[in-house]
Amino acid sequence: GYVVFLVDMYGVTGRPTGQEVPMEFLGPLIKQPQETRARINAALEAMTSAAKARGVGDASRRAAFGYCFGGSNVLDLARSGADVAAVVSFHGNLRTGLPAEPGAVKAKVLAVHGADDPIAPKGDRDALEEEMRKAGAHWTILAFGGVFHSFTDPSANRPPSSQYSAHADRYGYALAHALLADAFAGKV
């Protein structure tokens, strides 16, 4: 099993409600990648300290999963050189203003996307691939044909932007769990 912590990237000053994430909350974080990266790294350290204080989990076996904006954040966590075994991004934004430096990425990186996701078009997937190559990272990008954004959310039903996909959801999670098992066992 896993010990799971959730991160609030918005803070106490306000947060979105409902399924839509207003740009008034998301926009400033997207425009300030240094701030976003600092927050996600601070969250990792706070979670690690909390787990140690409570005596739960194994701090040497850390990974990060993220969905949509969270998927972007876990990619930035990897780009920053954070000491995590793996990061898994589900339908996250792949672009960054702070690409990984050569040799910086320690985590095994998995980005799972719909090939028809307007938030992560092919050009962005190609750019992430090139960035990971230059960084010398261990990476996998999986794009499901005919699949849109939010494919892991059974309530998503707004094609052509977002729509649930049972097969992409199932296969993506299977690959993510296999990556975690291998990363924690030192097989990759």
Where are these predicted regions, by residue range?
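Serine-hydrolase catalytic machinery in alpha/beta-hydrolase-like enzymes
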Residues: 1-57, 152-158
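Alpha/beta-hydrolase fold nucleophile elbow
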Residues: 53-67
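Gly/Ala-rich beta-loop-alpha elbow adjacent to hydrolase catalytic centers
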Residues: 66-70, 74
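A conserved short beta-strand
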Residues: 83-93
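Short beta-strand/loop motif that positions the catalytic acidic residue
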Residues: 105, 111-113, 117, 144
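Acidic catalytic loop of the alpha/beta-hydrolase fold
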Residues: 116-120, 149
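Short alpha-helix in the alpha/beta-hydrolase fold that links the catalytic acid
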Residues: 121-132
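C-terminal catalytic histidine-bearing segment of alpha/beta-hydrolase fold enzymes
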Residues: 133-188
